[in-house]
Amino acid sequence: MYRVVTIEEVWDVAKDVKAFRFNENIEFAPGQFIMAWLPGVGEKPFSLAWEDMIVVKRVGPFTTKLFELKEGDRLWIRGPYGHGFIKRGEKVALVGGGIGIPPLYAFAKKNQGKFRQMTLIYGARSKDELSLLDIENYVDDAVITTDDGSAGRKGFPTEVLAERREEFDQVYACGPEPMLKAVLKVMNYKNVQISAERYMKCGIGVCGSCNLGKYLVCRDGPVFEGEKLVGLL
């Protein structure tokens, strides 16, 4: 069930955010996730940023331990699991907030040049917390926001989306739940796909810990069509 990968590269992405590249490529759809396990520590889900990369924010005991890994150390993984983003539309927006960049990064990289227009709208609390990787290389247009105005436009990505929504025939979103709720509201739950997050244990639809109404995020998501989430988010 698990495969053991070796960490080949670790680098800082933003404040308390690191990227880990390992020695094995995983066939995946942008938006899918893996379960990563450390013996004696536990297991957590992570969206794949690329076929050999995850991006991690330090938020608790597991990620703190993960941050100690160095080149040559081992990590146990299983997956990928779940449903990813569906390519749709001609003029699309990728809307992200905080650490929500990995699945959007994967989508942008895999679909570079396949849309008439692909716009990134991404925000974080401050310049130090921008976790962009090099996603700007794969999109046609990028608007960056920060809550405090320390980089890009002061404000929130959903404000930009509200101003420009008529430009897009499909929106892909990942980020904090309040942002996702705002995206769904701006889009009236139509022509939008969101990557949802819930506490997750098994990753395969058995334990039920990641329920979102009648859905299980690990099995039915983590990517959902907006119309399925009316009354749930």
Swiss-Prot record:
Residues 1-87 form the FAD-binding FR-type domain. This is Probable dihydroorotate dehydrogenase B (NAD(+)), electron transfer subunit. Binds 1 [2Fe-2S] cluster per subunit. Binds 1 FAD per subunit. It comes from the Archaea. The lineage of its organism: Archaea, Methanobacteriati, Methanobacteriota, Thermococci, Thermococcales. Responsible for channeling the electrons from the oxidation of dihydroorotate from the FMN redox center in the PyrD type B subunit to the ultimate electron acceptor NAD(+). Belongs to the PyrK family. It comes from Thermococcus kodakarensis (strain ATCC BAA-918 / JCM 12380 / KOD1) (Pyrococcus kodakaraensis (strain KOD1)). Pathway: Pyrimidine metabolism; UMP biosynthesis via de novo pathway; orotate from (S)-dihydroorotate (NAD(+) route): step 1/1. [2Fe-2S] cluster binds at C202, C207, C210, C218. Its cofactor is [2Fe-2S] cluster; FAD. CDD domains: DHOD_e_trans_like2 (cd06220).
